[in-house]
Amino acid sequence: MPTDHMDLLARLRSLSAREREVLEMASRGMTNTQVAGELHVSVHAVKFHLAGVYRKLSVANRTQATMLLYSFGAGQGAGLWPSEVRD
């Protein structure tokens, strides 16, 4: 998992809007099926987007991805991505 703040910022910025959306939902504890239903896409599409998240963030699973998201001040309760990521 990346530890340098600037490296993490670059990795978070590399996520597509859909990858960010899927990661936010997954970090709130939603299952792939629930995310798919909410976004009106297939479960396969959700898995595809999560695989992209894992690759871009250099993590192995949704728990590690969520930990990175929370460590940067985003995630459950925040509702928004940090401005450094959204820009």
Give the role of each language-model region:
Residues 20-21, 64:
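Pre-recognition alpha-helix immediately N-terminal to the DNA-recognition helix
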Residues 26-30, 69:
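Short helix-to-turn junction characteristic of helix-turn-helix DNA-binding domains
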Residues 1-18, 24, 78-87:
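Regulatory hinge/linker segments at domain boundaries
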Residues 24, 37, 67:
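A cross-family signal for key residues in well-ordered alpha-helices
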